[in-house]
Amino acid sequence: MTRTLIVWGAGRIGRGFVADLFDSPAFHTVFVDIDRALVEELNARGRYTIVHATRDGLSRRVVQNGFCAVHTDDAQALNALFEEDQLLLDVAVHEPKLPEVSDMLLPLLRHRMTVCPNAVMDVMMNVNMPHPDECFLSLTRERFTDAESAWFTAHVGVTGIFAMCISPIAPEWLLKEDSLVLFNNGYPEQAIDKNRLKGEAPALPRLRLTEDVAREETRKLYTLNMAHALISYLGLPMGLKTSREAAINETLRPILTGALEEASFGLSRELGFSEDEMTEWRQTILRLLENPYIEDSLQRLGADSRRKLGAYDRLVGPARLCAKHGKPPVQLAKAIAGGYSYENDDPGTHAVRDFVRAHGFEAALAEFSDLHPGDGIYEYVCM
């Protein structure tokens, strides 16, 4: 039986990573997106290129057939999809869009409950944030009645994911060849929590089933995503432009490695990763950042500083674990401080900078990062 995979969000991760993992005769992939022009182009062409850029070089593959695209306004097509047995849904959107996507999914889930109340489905949350599965569950429960919540709990599995796919905008020379091209680091797998699934677990070579995906999600957020934020907030004032340029910079490198060591210290004591595991993990992160083909923009990596400076997000989160277990988060604190000076033309960053100008740096630390004197972090950020 061919199963349907809905990828909600046909962007760089949805098309370039998730659909690549599920490119199998066992699955029919349906992209759902709000961009009508993209939906029409995908359907008209029926193919697109993915370029994997690893340290060893570039490789290409063409994804064709086996997929179609649907616009978010096409209620009839979406209702039909949500009647499929053993349905899989991968939500691949940016964190700020999650409430909006939850609102779009609500009538579709209600339709499924009405038309096929005994059918099960599973949702994979491919959203770059702490605990996206719990956030999605909270958003749905806020919108459901008690009876609907009971049905949802019994028939819909929701799992976070773990992956380290880095997917910047494709270079101009590739876009000239194929306007739909995706460009990423060729990360080989995605992990999901098998204990959260209601339906049959997908059997695919690059989909790994784990028993605690939240632990792996947290490690990734507090190391790889932390590193991206750090090199952005500290690299831009130095005149650096790209992730690789920052990762190998002789001034910034010791701060980066020191912050990774601080994060590792907290993670190993809080979540049980061994020192050997974390040493190997840090080397993996550095190799990803040193990839000569993935020149991600530091300006892009720092965007939405309000979110990235959040109390349990990629910078303050590992600093809290580090301080909790007795180690001063000196290098992480430098990145947190740098984030409050970051400038970008997005609403989250504007909110941070406007607040700093109106109320001062210390008040902003309390407002956005929940940092206060005596918490083991505040003093180092204010040094």
What are these regions (language model features)?
Residues T2-I6, R12-M383:
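Substrate/ligand-engaging "lid" and interaction regions
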